[in-house]
Structures are given as structure tokens and as C-alpha cells.
Swiss-Prot record:
Organism, as annotated: Thermococcus gammatolerans (strain DSM 15229 / JCM 11827 / EJ3)
Keyword flag Calcium: no
Annotated residues for binding of Mg(2+): D13, G42
Gene name for this UniProt entry: purA
Pathway info: Purine metabolism; AMP biosynthesis via de novo pathway; AMP from IMP: step 1/2
Protein name: Adenylosuccinate synthetase
Length: 339
């Protein structure tokens, strides 16, 4: 698969970071690019028991041989960018990352507006990262671009050209999406959504490749979907139910407690169709069946867990190629060669 996109199929927090990190190490892509909105979405990954979280840089940073890129469609917050460069200096990120010169910049005024606007902060439940106001300025053609920020100059590049050149040379390219289908400005639970589309086609556009250059779309689903902030959640369970099941989680960016629900097969099928999914990655199967924890062989999954996977494949209509059975990178079942 010369190029593949990983996107969220629910309301974000599906565990895309752990899937991307695994693919980055297992497949050794030569280029890893991040699409999506901006710093309003955090990806986290556990490496040798230590948790790393990023909001700006690609989660594939752990593949130290890869070129890391931030596509033109992504908003850049210089403060967050440089903080992550320092935080991840052991991975030599600064020497490998490129920002598209056309990226719009999140300024302090955008963050202040995001946090003080009653509609965005109180009703919608925005993360306060400034992404919505920054995208609004971009639509109005008022936003500052990365090429206008002197301190970013050493990192500037043409991401679209780099990626298309890499594909022409037969290199493997991994493209990361952020957030999830249910938060898409067009297809999500409007108005409780993010400030742009989050589907695979939008992520491809963010980094500058056309639809014919995408070979696979991996949509990530969580065994128990979650969402942060306000908005419809048809299969939501009570906090008491979530606590009994050990499903208490907090957002990477906001620190707010996540709402938890039961797996919605109809929503998952619709999400897979709109995203053009060729494969599903299922996370937190060990939360659905605690006896699945740490299993790395599909045939060794307990009956309850295996039946759940088979039901997803049957009702969603897409094969499940990757299954996370725990938080560590090695807690995964890779079925890509047999599906």
C-alpha cells in the first residue's frame, strides 16, 4: 500500500494514536504526514510504559527514519509546535519535520476568542485551542500563514510536492487524520462539531494528494465510543454504568471527562461508507472482554471478543484488520495479511 490514511470513525478519541504508532514502527513508512484541523485534537501513545501526547506533530514521530510533515490544511500554533519539538527531542523530531508554508497560524487572539465566546465555549464545548476562530479568519482571507512567521522558516516546505514526489518514487506514505467522523463540519452532529470536515477525503486534501493516490483508508473504531463536550450521543450510557465497566476516561487536550456509549453499528456503517473504508482498526477490545487483554493472535481471542469482531465485520461490511487488546504498542492483533 504506497499510501494509506488513518481516520477516526466516531467522535474522536478512538485510539488513532496507538494505531498510527504501530503502523509507523511495523510498516516503516518513509513519509508520515498529518492532516486535520490543528491543535484541538491530541493523540497519545504508550512506549515502554511512558505516555507521549502530541497535538501538532504527527503521531508517527516514533519512527525515527521517517520524514514528518504537517499539511497545508492544518492550523499551526507556533507555541505548541516548539513545545513538542523540545518534548520529543530524544526522537530528533526537529531535524525531520516540515511545515507547509501555506498553513494558517493560530494566534493568541484566536485562543482568547475561543475561550471567551459563549456560543463556542459554553454551548458547543470547544477545546479553547483557537482553531475555530483561526479557520474563520482563513475563510475570510485574514489569517497569517506559516511563511509569514520568521521562527518557522527553517521548517517550511511544500508538503504536497514532497508527498507526491515520494509516491512517484514508490515510497510508503502514512497520512494521519484527527478527531472523528461524528465531529465533521459537514457530516457530524452539527452544530456540535469541529471547524472543518474530518473525513478521509478531507484529510487527503489537507496534505495535497488527490483521491486516486490513496490506496487504503483505515477507519478506527473504539469498542465503547466516547465524546468530549456537548452534542447528541444516541448510545450514551450513564456515568454510573461507565464506572462499573471501568470506562472512565479524560480528554488529552481538555482534561474533561469523556462521555461513554455502546457501540453503534448503524453509525459505524455510515461512517465507513462516507470515509470509503477499506479496513477497520478496532481499539480497546480488552474493555469489551477483559479476557482479551494482551492477546496478539486472533485465534486465541475468547469467544465473546471474537463474536464482537465478527458482528462488526458483518454489520458494517468492512473487514477488521487491526485489533488493539491493551495500551502498549505490542498489544495488537494484525490480520492484514489474511483479510
Amino acid at each position: 500500500m504506497p499510501s494509506y490514511i488513518v481516520v477516526g470513525g466516531q467522535w474522536g478519541d478512538e485510539g488513532k494514536g496507538s494505531i498510527i504508532a504501530y503502523l509507523a514502527l511495523k510498516d516503516e513508512p518513509e513519509v508520515i504526514a498529518r492532516g486535520g484541523v490543528g491543535t484541538n485534537a491530541g493523540h497519545s501513545v504508550f512506549i515502554n510504559g511512558k505516555r507521549y501526547a502530541v497535538r501538532q506533530l504527527p503521531t508517527g514521530f516514533i519512527q525515527t527514519k521517517a520524514r514528518l510533515l504537517i499539511g497545508a490544511g492544518v492550523l499551526v500554533d507556533p507555541e505548541v509546535f516548539f513545545h513538542e519539538l523540545e518534548h520529543l527531542k530524544d526522537f530528533n523530531v526537529a531535524g525531520r519535520v516540515g511545515i507547509d508554508h501555506r498553513c494558517a497560524i493560530i494566534e493568541e487572539k484566536h485562543k482568547q476568542l475561543d475561550r471567551s465566546n459563549s456560543h463556542l465555549h459554553d454551548k458547543i464545548g470547544t477545546t479553547g485551542s483557537g482553531c475555530g476562530p483561526a479557520n474563520a479568519d482563513r475563510v475570510m482571507r485574514k489569517a497569517k500563514l506559516a511563511k509569514e512567521v520568521p521562527e518557522l522558516e527553517p521548517y517550511l516546505t511544500d508538503v504536497a510536492q514532497e508527498i507526491n514526489d515520494a509516491l512517484d518514487e514508490g515510497k510508503l506514505v502514512l497520512i494521519e487524520g484527527t478527531q472523528g467522523f461524528g465531529l465533521s463540519l459537514y457530516y457530524g452532529t452539527y452544530p456540535y462539531v469541529t471547524s472543518k470536515d474530518t473525513t478521509a477525503s478531507a484529510i487527503a486534501s489537507d496534505v495535497g494528494i488527490g483521491p486516486t493516490r490513496v490506496d487504503d483508508v483505515i477507519v478506527v473504531f473504539k469498542s465503547f465510543p466516547t465524546r468530549v463536550g456537548a452534542g447528541p450521543f444516541p448510545t450514551e450510557m450513564s456515568q454510573e454504568e461507565a464506572e462499573k465497566l471501568g470506562l472512565v476516561e479524560y480528554g488529552t487536550v481538555t482534561g474533561r471527562r469523556r462521555r461513554v456509549g455502546w457501540f453503534d453499528f448503524d453509525f459505524a456503517r455510515y461512517s465507513a461508507r462516507i470515509n470509503g473504508a477499506t479496513m477497520i482498526a478496532l481499539t480497546m477490545l480488552d474493555k469489551y472482554d477483559k479476557n482479551a487483554f494482551g492477546v496478539t493472535d486472533y485465534d486465541r481471542l475468547p469467544k465473546k471478543a471474537r463474536e464482537f469482531v465478527e458482528e462488526i465485520e458483518g454489520r458494517v461490511g468492512v473487514p477488521v484488520g487491526l485489533i488493539k487488546t491493551g495500551p502498549e504498542l505490542e498489544h495488537i492483533i494484525d490480520r492484514r495479511e489474511v483479510i
